[in-house]
C-alpha cells in the first residue's frame, strides 16, 4: 500500500501556518491525495485544494494552478527528487510502497550468489533499497547502487 509522508505535511502546515494549500500528485495517488486534502481542510480549517490535472513528475508540478488558487504552499506528492523544494512554495513529499520484498530477495539469492549485480528501483521503493542491498550482500551477492 502506498504511504504518503503526512507527518511532514502536517509539520510544515503547523510551522508556516498558511491560509491555504494545494496538493497534487500522479494519477494513481489521486484518491489518497484527495482524502488527505479533505482531512487537511478539516484539521486546520483552511482551504485545501486538490490539483487533479495529470502530472508527470518534477518537471510538471502545476505550480501555476496553485498560484491561480492563491495557495500559499503546493505539496507535490510522490515524485521523489534530490531537491526538497523547487520554488519557495512548492514542497516535495515522498510516497512509498510498504510492500515487503523479503520473499523475492530470498529467491534472488539462490540465482545471484557469487555474482555482482546493479540494484535499481523506482521512487516508491527507494526507502527499501539499502535493506535489500544489505540482505543480498549478507548472502553472498555483490551489490552496486548508482546515483540517479
Residue positions per predicted region:
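An N-terminal assembly and electron-transfer interface module characteristic of large anaerobic redox
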Residues: 1-148
Amino acid at each position: 500500500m502506498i504511504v504518503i509522508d503526512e507527518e511532514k505535511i502536517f509539520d510544515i502546515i503547523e510551522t508556516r501556518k498558511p491560509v491555504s494549500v494545494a496538493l497534487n500528485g500522479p494519477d494513481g495517488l489521486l484518491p489518497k491525495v484527495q482524502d488527505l486534502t479533505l482531512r487537511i481542510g478539516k484539521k486546520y480549517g483552511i482551504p485545501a485544494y486538490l490539483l487533479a490535472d495529470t502530472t508527470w513528475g518534477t518537471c510538471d508540478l502545476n505550480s501555476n494552478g496553485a498560484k491561480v488558487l492563491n495557495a500559499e504552499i503546493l505539496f507535490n506528492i510522490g515524485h521523489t527528487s534530490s531537491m526538497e523544494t523547487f520554488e519557495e512554495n512548492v514542497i516535495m513529499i515522498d510516497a512509498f510502497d510498504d510492500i515487503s520484498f523479503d520473499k523475492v530477495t530470498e529467491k534472488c539469492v539462490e540465482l545471484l550468489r557469487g555474482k555482482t549485480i546493479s540494484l535499481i528501483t523506482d521512487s516508491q521503493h527507494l526507502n527499501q533499497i539499502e535493506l535489500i542491498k544489505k540482505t543480498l550482500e549478507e548472502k553472498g551477492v555483490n551489490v552496486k547502487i548508482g546515483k540517479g
